[in-house]
């Protein structure tokens, strides 16, 4: 994922920042408690495609 793109993307729910997951397969929105998938290098920013973060993931800094 291009870091410049990551800098301008925001969570569609909270409008807050997103963080790239450690394995670089998801964009994490702590505010919404969601992880948006990245497929073929393209972030899928749909709430219906996102997974809910686990309690442990929500607590990670």
From Swiss-Prot:
Q: Which Gene3D superfamilies match?
A: 2.20.25.10
SUPFAM superfamilies according to UniProt: Trm112p-like (SSF158997)
InterPro entries in the cross-refs: Trm112-like
Q: Which GO terms describe its cellular component?
A: cytosol
Q: Which family does it belong to?
A: Belongs to the UPF0434 family.
Q: PANTHER family this protein is in?
A: PROTEIN PREY, MITOCHONDRIAL (PTHR33505:SF4), ZGC:162634 (PTHR33505)
Protein name, UniProt field: UPF0434 protein PP_1901
């Amino acid at each position: 994922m291009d870091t410049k793109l990551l800098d301008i993307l925001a969570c569609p729910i909270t409008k807050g920042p997103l963080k790239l997951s450690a394995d670089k397969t998801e964009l994490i929105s702590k505010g919404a408690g969601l992880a948006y998938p990245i497929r073929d290098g393209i972030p899928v920013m749909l709430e219906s495609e996102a997974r809910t973060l686990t309690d442990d993931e929500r607590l990670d800094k």
